[in-house]
Amino acid sequence: SGLEYGTIAIQRYERSDGTNSWLVTIPGTDGQPDSPFGWAQNVELMSADQERRRKADSARMVAEAMRQAGIGKDEPVALIGHSQGGIVAATLASDWAEEYTIEHVVTAGSPVANHPIPQRTWVTSVEIDDELVAALDGAANPVTDNWLTVQGHVSPAPAATPSTVHSDGSCTPGATPITGLTPYDAAPVAGSTNGRELSHWIKYHQAAYQNATDLGS
């Protein structure tokens, strides 16, 4: 987009047979007035009207970037996106199916249950059960052979506890609570800083996916 925000990443992988595969990483809403990833685009992307979805600035930007990158019609593409980025990914898989071979869509915290993603595309959706955004479509994700939904649960942050002095004189510090807007704002997660992030934050979705992987899901 030429901006410090609203930026996507396109990576090309050359396979052993000389053909290419591609990975497109799409950001979420940044709310900037001149960004293609503004608030209004979310409404357009979730429309039941295909033409309206295709006209969303964020979807058009990603489609144009893919064209300029030289992605061929028959070259496999994986799309990964958080929040609005996931809705864009679902829109591209649904509405650009004739232009590209979208093999895999990965969404994190994205309301995409109503998108008509074709059966040829594998979908992995990561959702956190206490946060609102992924539920804005008002529907559960399809239960099909090509659609996997990973649902994470964020435990509340620990309450304050006193320090413990042991018989040998050593001391175990107690937990110091970090307060936020909800009990989940301060729940510890790998990569967090001050613990004030909402559970829509991408780190929660990454942690949920990693936990599911560790459990053998």
Regions from the language model: what does each represent?
Residues 19, 74-76, 102:
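A general structural motif
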Residues 26-60, 72, 99-104, 110-217:
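Lipolytic serine-hydrolase domain surface
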Residues 65-76:
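Gly/Ser-rich "nucleophile elbow"/oxyanion-hole loop immediately N-terminal to the catalytic nucleophile
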Residues 80-90:
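Gly/Ala-rich beta-loop-alpha elbow adjacent to hydrolase catalytic centers
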Residues 91-95:
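Active-site signature of alpha/beta-hydrolase-fold catalytic machinery across serine-
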